[in-house]
């Protein structure tokens, strides 16, 4: 049986043998494409090649592109093939081969490479596209296996842009998956028998956005083959979740709960097990999305794509609760196995930390929610749906947990009413955001040429005329509130070429309004976002924030110097895959087989600083793109998108670097002042991201903060050692006054101290306890020993030793940290689990164990008096 990794490689190898250039999977986070929240298909990263905006590196391309779609999240785990994260296998022709070759390639791959049975293959085609039908017949396929589709099913059209008919390849898995036959395909009925494995789109026409179609001069092939579906067929798995892409993750989840995932239940369809299987699938699917998205640079917040990640983590977390998982944080433990099951590289420690932090935050949310609901349940036996929705919307408390808690308390809630509140909220949200932005984009589409001039290279202040003033509803004469404008000339740089937009303000009638954002439309006009009161008939005074611009220039110029040094230090193969320059820091993405060593990073940093100290003047010039190449200017595809090829702008730091660039730059390298690399992240297969800062002030502050953190880390280890060995002493004896050199010295001492701590722990495996000085309490039926100052590193061992020493003793130990307390309960005579549950009446505890020893966690403050009160009943 072929593994998923082997299947993916067979796809790439096959099309490489057909002269296709392999492109690595791009980041899930789109670059310079505001229309997408995520990369959601194989062709999404190639759109500019198909539109002619950019020249493709080859007319034939093959890839396996990781993608995310979250528009139908409720179906995940319920259907056999629905995922939020998936891979799309693609082969593309940009003005090269067309239908005949594309279908011949498809036949050869499915029959000769995948070895699928010819008689089990079915094909759909657009009913007017008889050419495609004839090609399938000429390739030797059964006419009864060719099914004519409608415009709805077999014509790819997404509004403005290239479109055309498509043909789909289906694989028949047999009647055990559905006794109904080919009518399932003919009537387009959702089923698990006929699995679509390949969709081939023939980009033949251009839609002008008003459903007027003209034939394209260059016809293209855009295909997408479902990787997970192909793997499930070749591994004879009932669903995609029963393949080696998901099962290792599911088996890892099983270790966190006493529930089991049963593959065979697909056919047995036992209701309780079906629900359990669904829970496993949801967690596995969502965490694949989360791990890979965070690995590509996504975060967790309440805004944009980061909110999607928060939603997926929280949905997976509450699903884990439904599986009976009691750990305060558990999802982060899946990160290594997720990485192993795929081919995408990232920093697992960073990804796991982001997930764990969100889990702990959500755990507190759940605890707070419980307390609020407890009060509501005490008031009434029926809870208003508005309260349920408020818990969900304001506090992020899952409605499923509210429902379970209500059931336990015998309280009624109306889920139908809750659903009404939720739908009303979604409609309001969509009308405010989605529809509004769509209208803005549609308005900009009506501006069919460049009408403005950017003068920000030469001046930071202008008096400008308003050419267009509008908001999310319509064109305006007067703006009151948030809206957009385009000027005849502007000093504000728009976000492009990796550089963030300028900050500043516009002034009219003595009133100043802050510039919130500046971006470019399709004709490179500068669109300004502002909130205020503006009259389109009056001129605007425009003022760029000079300090902010200077910081942007520092970081952008430092990016160019970094690029030069990377080529010198790592190799001429280094190219710029992406950059982001804002007023606070810069990032630079580049390919490399291995992560640069610490020593190499130090050398890169050193060489950039040397160039800064040379005090080299910046020079601008304008040339044709061909002349720029002759001059040896570095040209990135990212920059050519924003420039006229007959008049490109070149930024030069003499004898160091010449780059084609439309951004703004510092007049002399000495104004950058300093340069510090603050992190190097692995962003995917062979792609690394350097983050750096500039200026003496920021570098000094970073170094001081980093040094202070290292000292704190060092002192914490020393304290741990001293708890075990009170006579241990350590004092820093620095050899240098330089803060960065001192950091190195502290880092080296931390490594040595960690080894010392391991030795100390080993010598204390049998914890020494002075049994003679212990003080016991007799309360109710318990003889109890309580110690709320136990060492967290030995607390479990202490509990076990005391239990073995005293047969009739109840031992309660706690180790109090800043934000949480570790609790250990041990006893031979008393049931530790029962005591743990008693304490839950006073404390929000998580954890578990057995009758003789339980360990748990709480964020509540634990006191001896309260423990005794609980034991006394």
Swiss-Prot record:
Identify the Gene3D superfamilies for this entry: 2.40.30.130, Bira Bifunctional Protein, Domain 2 (3.30.930.10), Threonyl-trna Synthetase, Chain A, domain 2 (3.30.980.10)
Q: Which species does this protein come from?
A: Mycoplasmopsis pulmonis (strain UAB CTIP) (Mycoplasma pulmonis)
Q: Give the family from UniProt.
A: Belongs to the class-II aminoacyl-tRNA synthetase family.
UniProt keyword Oxidoreductase present: no
What name goes with this protein?
A: Alanine--tRNA ligase
Per its Swiss-Prot or TrEMBL entry, what cofactor is needed? Zn(2+)
Q: What is its main location?
A: cytoplasm
Q: Name one Pfam family in it.
A: tRNA-synt_2c
Q: Which reaction does it catalyse?
A: tRNA(Ala) + L-alanine + ATP = L-alanyl-tRNA(Ala) + AMP + diphosphate
Q: What biological-process GO terms show up in the record?
A: alanyl-tRNA aminoacylation
Q: What EC number(s) has UniProt assigned to this enzyme? A: 6.1.1.7
Instruction: Provide the alphabetized UniProt keywords.
Output: Aminoacyl-tRNA synthetase, ATP-binding, Cytoplasm, Ligase, Metal-binding, Nucleotide-binding, Protein biosynthesis, RNA-binding, tRNA-binding, Zinc
Q: Where in the cell is it found?
A: Cytoplasm
- Main EC class the enzyme belongs to: ligase
UniProt GO molecular function: alanine-tRNA ligase activity; aminoacyl-tRNA deacylase activity; ATP binding; tRNA binding; zinc ion binding
Query: So where does Zn(2+) get bound?
Result: 556, 560, 661, 665
GO cellular component term of the entry, any: cytosol
| Job description of the protein | Catalyzes the attachment of alanine to tRNA(Ala) in a two-step reaction: alanine is first activated by ATP to form Ala-AMP and then transferred to the acceptor end of tRNA(Ala). Also edits incorrectly charged Ser-tRNA(Ala) and Gly-tRNA(Ala) via its editing domain.
Return the domain comment text from this UniProt entry: Consists of three domains; the N-terminal catalytic domain, the editing domain and the C-terminal C-Ala domain. The editing domain removes incorrectly charged amino acids, while the C-Ala domain, along with tRNA(Ala), serves as a bridge to cooperatively bring together the editing and aminoacylation centers thus stimulating deacylation of misacylated tRNAs.
Q: Which SMART domains match?
A: tRNA_SAD
**Please, which domain of life does this record's source organism belong to?**
Bacteria
Q: Does the keyword Membrane apply?
A: no
Manner of cofactor binding, per the entry note: Binds 1 zinc ion per subunit.
């Amino acid at each position: 049986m072929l593994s998923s990794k082997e299947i993916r490689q067979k796809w790439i190898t096959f099309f490489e043998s057909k002269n296709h250039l392999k492109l690595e999977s791009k980041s899930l986070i789109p670059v310079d494409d505001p229309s997408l929240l995520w990369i959601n298909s194989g062709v999404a990263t190639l759109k500019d090649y198909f539109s002619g905006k950019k020249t493709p590196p080859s007319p034939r391309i093959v890839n396996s592109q990781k993608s995310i779609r979250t528009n139908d999240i409720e179906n995940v785990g319920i259907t056999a093939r629905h995922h939020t994260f998936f891979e799309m296998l693609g082969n593309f022709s940009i003005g090269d081969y067309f239908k005949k070759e594309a279908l011949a390639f498809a036949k050869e791959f499915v029959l000769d490479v995948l070895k699928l049975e010819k008689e089990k293959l079915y094909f759909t085609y657009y009913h007017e596209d008889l050419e495609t039908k004839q090609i399938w017949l000429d390739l030797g396929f059964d006419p009864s296996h060719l099914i004519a589709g409608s415009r709805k099913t077999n014509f790819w059209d997404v509004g403005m842009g290239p479109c055309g008919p498509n043909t789909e390849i289906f694989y028949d898995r047999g009647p055990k998956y559905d006794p109904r036959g080919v009518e399932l395909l003919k009537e387009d009925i959702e089923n698990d028998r006929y699995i679509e494995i390949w969709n081939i789109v023939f980009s033949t026409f251009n839609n002008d956005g008003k459903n007027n179609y003209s034939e394209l001069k260059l016809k293209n092939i855009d295909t997408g083959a479902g990787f997970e579906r192909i793997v499930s067929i070749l591994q004879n798995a009932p669903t995609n979740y029963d393949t080696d892409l998901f099962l290792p993750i599911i088996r890892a989840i099983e270790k966190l709960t006493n529930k089991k995932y049963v593959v065979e239940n697909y056919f047995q369809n036992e209701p309780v097990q079906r629900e359990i299987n669904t829970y496993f699938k949801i967690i596995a699917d969502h965490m694949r999305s989360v791990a890979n998205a965070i690995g590509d640079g996504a975060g967790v917040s309440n805004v944009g794509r980061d909110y999607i990640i928060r939603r997926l983590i929280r949905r997976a977390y509450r699903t884990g609760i439904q599986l009976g998982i009691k750990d305060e944080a558990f999802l982060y433990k899946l990160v290594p196995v997720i990485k192993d099951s795929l081919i995408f590289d990232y920093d697992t420690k960073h990804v796991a930390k982001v997930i764990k932090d969100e889990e702990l935050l959500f755990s507190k949310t759940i605890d707070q929610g419980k307390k609020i609901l407890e009060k509501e349940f005490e008031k009434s036996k029926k809870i208003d749906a508005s309260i349920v929705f408020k818990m969900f919307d304001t506090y992020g408390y899952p409605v499923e947990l509210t429902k379970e808690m209500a059931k336990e308390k015998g309280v009624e809630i109306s889920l139908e009413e809750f659903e009404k509140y939720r739908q009303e909220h979604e409609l309001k949200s969509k009308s405010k955001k989605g529809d509004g932005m769509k209208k803005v984009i549609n308005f900009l589409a009506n501006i069919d040429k460049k009408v403005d001039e950017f003068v920000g290279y030469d001046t930071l202040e202008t008096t400008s005329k308003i050419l267009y003033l509008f908001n999310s509803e319509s064109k305006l004469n007067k703006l009151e509130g948030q809206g957009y404008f385009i000027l005849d000339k502007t000093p504000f740089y728009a976000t492009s070429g990796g550089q963030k937009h300028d900050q500043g303000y516009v002034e009219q009638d003595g009133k100043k309004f802050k510039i919130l954002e500046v971006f470019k439309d399709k004709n490179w006009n500068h669109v300004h976002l502002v909130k205020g009161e503006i009259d389109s008939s009056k001129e605007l005074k425009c003022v760029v924030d000079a300090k902010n611009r200077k910081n942007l220039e520092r970081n952008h110029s430092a990016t160019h110097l970094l690029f030069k040094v990377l080529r010198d230090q790592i190799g001429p193969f280094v190219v710029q895959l992406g950059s982001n320059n804002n007023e606070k820091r810069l990032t630079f993405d580049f390919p490399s087989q291995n992560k640069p060593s610490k020593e190499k990073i130090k050398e890169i940093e050193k060489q950039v600083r040397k160039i800064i100290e040379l005090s080299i003047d910046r020079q601008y010039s304008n040339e044709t793109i061909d002349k720029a190449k002759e001059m040896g200017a570095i040209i990135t595809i990212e920059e050519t998108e924003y420039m006229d090829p007959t008049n490109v702008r070149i930024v030069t730091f003499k004898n160091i670097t010449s780059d084609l660039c439309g951004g703004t730059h510092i007049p002399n390298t000495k104004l950058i002042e300093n340069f510090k690399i603050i992190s190097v992240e692995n962003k995917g297969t062979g792609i690394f991201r350097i983050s750096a800062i500039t200026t003496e002030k920021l570098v000094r502050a970073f170094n001081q903060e980093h040094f202070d953190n290292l000292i704190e880390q060092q002192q914490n280890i020393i304290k741990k050692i001293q708890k075990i060995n009170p006579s241990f002493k350590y004092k820093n004896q620095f050899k240098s006054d330089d803060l960065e050199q001192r950091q190195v010295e502290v880092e080296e001492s931390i490594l040595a101290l960690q080894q010392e701590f391991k030795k100390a722990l080993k010598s204390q495996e049998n914890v020494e306890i002075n049994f003679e000085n212990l003080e016991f309490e007799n309360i109710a039926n318990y003889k109890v020993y309580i110690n709320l100052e136990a060492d967290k590193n030995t607390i479990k061992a202490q509990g076990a030793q005391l239990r073995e020493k005293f047969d009739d003793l109840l031992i309660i130990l706690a180790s109090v940290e800043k934000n949480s307390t570790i609790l250990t309960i041990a006893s031979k005579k008393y049931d530790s689990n029962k005591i743990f549950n008693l304490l839950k009446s006073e404390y929000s505890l998580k954890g578990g164990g057995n009758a003789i020893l339980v360990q748990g966690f709480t964020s509540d403050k634990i006191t001896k008096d309260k423990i005794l009160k609980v034991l006394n009943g």
